[in-house]
Amino acid sequence: MSKAVLFFADGTEECEALLVADLLRRARVEVIIASAMGRRALVSSHGIHLNADALAEDVDYSDVDMVCLLYTS
Protein backbone atom coordinates (compact mmCIF):
# COMPACT_ATOMS: atom_id res chain seq x y z
CA MET A 1 0.00 0.00 0.00
CA SER A 2 1.25 3.49 -0.83
CA LYS A 3 1.77 5.95 1.99
CA ALA A 4 1.36 9.74 2.01
CA VAL A 5 2.06 12.38 4.62
CA LEU A 6 0.00 15.57 4.51
CA PHE A 7 1.35 18.50 6.50
CA PHE A 8 -1.28 20.62 8.23
CA ALA A 9 -0.71 23.82 10.23
CA ASP A 10 -2.83 26.50 11.78
CA GLY A 11 -4.52 28.38 8.95
CA THR A 12 -4.75 25.37 6.64
CA GLU A 13 -7.58 25.69 4.12
CA GLU A 14 -9.78 22.88 5.44
CA CYS A 15 -11.66 22.11 2.21
CA GLU A 16 -8.50 21.82 0.15
CA ALA A 17 -6.64 19.81 2.78
CA LEU A 18 -9.44 17.41 3.64
CA LEU A 19 -10.29 16.86 -0.03
CA VAL A 20 -6.73 15.68 -0.69
CA ALA A 21 -6.87 13.35 2.34
CA ASP A 22 -10.27 12.00 1.29
CA LEU A 23 -9.28 11.32 -2.33
CA LEU A 24 -6.07 9.58 -1.32
CA ARG A 25 -7.89 7.40 1.20
CA ARG A 26 -10.52 6.47 -1.41
CA ALA A 27 -7.60 5.40 -3.63
CA ARG A 28 -6.46 3.15 -0.76
CA VAL A 29 -3.39 5.23 0.03
CA GLU A 30 -2.43 5.23 3.70
CA VAL A 31 -2.65 8.88 4.77
CA ILE A 32 -0.94 10.39 7.79
CA ILE A 33 -1.96 13.94 8.65
CA ALA A 34 1.09 15.46 10.32
CA SER A 35 1.11 18.68 12.27
CA ALA A 36 3.86 21.15 11.43
CA MET A 37 3.00 23.14 14.57
CA GLY A 38 4.54 20.96 17.30
CA ARG A 39 1.07 20.03 18.61
CA ARG A 40 -1.71 17.85 17.25
CA ALA A 41 -4.57 20.32 17.84
CA LEU A 42 -4.88 22.77 14.93
CA VAL A 43 -7.28 25.51 13.84
CA SER A 44 -8.15 25.87 10.14
CA SER A 45 -8.38 29.11 8.21
CA HIS A 46 -12.09 29.34 9.05
CA GLY A 47 -11.82 28.42 12.73
CA ILE A 48 -12.57 24.70 12.45
CA HIS A 49 -10.64 22.62 14.99
CA LEU A 50 -8.66 19.73 13.50
CA ASN A 51 -6.57 17.01 15.12
CA ALA A 52 -3.52 15.69 13.31
CA ASP A 53 -2.63 11.99 13.39
CA ALA A 54 0.94 12.76 14.46
CA LEU A 55 3.52 15.48 14.84
CA ALA A 56 5.72 15.95 11.78
CA GLU A 57 8.85 15.18 13.78
CA ASP A 58 7.43 11.83 14.97
CA VAL A 59 6.58 10.40 11.53
CA ASP A 60 8.73 7.60 10.11
CA TYR A 61 9.50 8.83 6.58
CA SER A 62 11.48 5.76 5.50
CA ASP A 63 8.55 4.21 3.61
CA VAL A 64 6.63 7.34 2.57
CA ASP A 65 5.81 7.60 -1.15
CA MET A 66 4.32 11.09 -1.22
CA VAL A 67 4.51 14.29 0.82
CA CYS A 68 1.88 17.03 0.42
CA LEU A 69 2.49 20.58 1.59
CA LEU A 70 -0.88 22.29 1.84
CA TYR A 71 -1.63 26.00 1.61
CA THR A 72 -2.07 27.95 4.82
CA SER A 73 -3.28 31.51 5.05
Question: PLM features: what roles do these ranges have?
Answer:
Residues R28-I32:
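A generic structural motif
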Residues A56-D63:
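Short amphipathic alpha-helix with an adjacent loop that forms part of the alpha/beta core around
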Residues M1-A4:
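Extreme N-terminal starter segment of soluble prokaryotic enzymes
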Residues Y71-T72:
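Conserved small/polar residues in nucleotide/adenosyl-binding loops
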Residues A34-D53:
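N-terminal beta-loop-helix "entrance" segment that forms/cooperates
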Residues T12-A17, A41:
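Short N-terminal binding/cap micro-motifs at the start of the first secondary-structure element
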